[in-house]
């Protein structure tokens, strides 16, 4: 049913055409996720236009890529920063980002001739400096970084399976169990890790999840960088993550918000890959 023009609000009016940003969804990418993002039913009130939902996603991808503050979102995003922030928070509560990652990851693997669900994965962590306004933090004594540590689990092609953010003073072996708990891919049966995941706690967490934990110990470097077997894949994923300015520092007041932006970065990456047909080689 159409809404009378006299009572239309910005939610019911189609967004004004604007110049496109590099982070914007293509028409093909939007058609791929539209049915997952746009609600099929409403609990009252007037339904929001599908074009408005696309604006919300574009706004979130823009913030993730450029690192701009919420209130600095360009005004030509007619959805507005407040509405975009509300949907960011809502998707954290409903788990929509995890669902999008799973669906897009399975499609990417299938198109590359692999099984939809991986059976092996690689784990790693990286420490990120936190801004003064950020929330929980700690000091990574080894890297001399005051901030947070993000622990990620990726498949053998580098696609994100799970992320867990902690204060930087939390050891990798202590966070491994929580990271596995956030992994929704039950088919993973083997995980490669570095020496920071040795000890009783990681072994018990892996055994509880039915996973074979393999510690990769590379040769002592004779000079220069030595690539460790298997583990170089997760290092490449860390490089992809750092292409997004919102993630090179911790700006968020909660650790869950940082996890949310990290998942958004990988959702945008998967959509671009599926558009271009470049499934595993490049951005």
Describe the role of every protein-language-model region:
Residues 1-283:
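Short alpha-helical elements
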């Amino acid at each position: 049913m159409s809404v009378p023009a006299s009572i239309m609000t910005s939610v019911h009016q189609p967004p004004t055409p604007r110049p496109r940003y590099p982070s914007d969804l293509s028409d093909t990418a939007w058609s791929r996720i539209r049915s997952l993002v746009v609600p099929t039913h409403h609990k009252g009130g007037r339904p929001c236009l599908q074009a408005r939902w696309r604006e919300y996603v574009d706004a979130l991808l823009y913030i993730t890529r450029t690192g701009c503050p919420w209130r600095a979102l360009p005004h030509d995003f007619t959805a507005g920063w407040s509405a975009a922030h509300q949907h960011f928070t809502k998707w954290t509560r409903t788990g929509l980002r995890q669902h999008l990652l799973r669906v897009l990851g399975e499609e990417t693997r299938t198109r590359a001739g692999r099984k939809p669900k991986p059976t092996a994965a690689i784990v790693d962590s990286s420490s990120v400096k936190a801004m003064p306004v950020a929330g929980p933090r700690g000091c990574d004594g080894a890297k001399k970084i005051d901030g947070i540590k993000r622990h990620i689990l990726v498949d053998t092609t580098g696609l994100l399976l799970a992320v867990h953010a902690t204060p930087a003073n939390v050891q990798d072996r202590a966070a491994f169990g929580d990271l596995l708990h956030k992994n929704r891919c039950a088919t993973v049966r083997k995980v490669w890790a570095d020496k920071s995941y040795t000890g009783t706690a990681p072994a018990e967490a892996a055994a509880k999840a039915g996973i074979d934990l393999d510690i990769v110990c590379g040769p002592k470097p004779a000079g220069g960088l030595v690539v460790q077997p298997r583990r170089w894949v997760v290092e490449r994923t860390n490089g992809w993550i750092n292409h997004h300015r919102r993630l090179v520092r911790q700006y968020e007041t909660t650790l869950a918000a940082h996890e949310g932006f990290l998942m958004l970065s990988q959702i945008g990456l998967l959509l671009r890959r599926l558009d271009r047909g470049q499934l595993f080689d490049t951005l």
